[in-house]
């Protein structure tokens, strides 16, 4: 118990230190400085796009790293790795709030017509970022609970199935991140098709797990996770 309390305190302090460092870095961010100083509507819009793109790239990088970390830790019954991923999710939620506040302040510097025309896309981007972080948390939570309670691990077949689809998802996230970093969305239809294919694979895996439950050929707790 003492060790767990110590770990919780360490994680909290570490998160706060990282959060303060990120905020200090944002204060020194040249894009944000220019955003808040400019009075030219066109320039403000261009800078807001740049800032939003930079922030969404960071969110995609977070998602890529922590999705892989969560699944790998679950497959290898690594409780410490899962706790680290969950701590990262809590920290990232704080950064999302800061990102939204900064973006909203920048939006207030645009004229009303531009806000009406472009504002929806900005808020959709924020929702997209929040959903990614929330999804990683929702993925990590049952995995952490499962391992923490020493429930039966995945069998070899299940590990193989989920390892394969995990690699494909991480690779897709990498491609999307690189496209956003370079602001080059040529042939993006290929990534959309790949995402749809992955959704199909996940649906197939879900049906396989339901079949295992019905035939009682595996652990119900494992299949539910």
Regions found by a protein language model. Name each.
Residues 1-225:
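Cytosolic, long alpha-helical scaffolding segments
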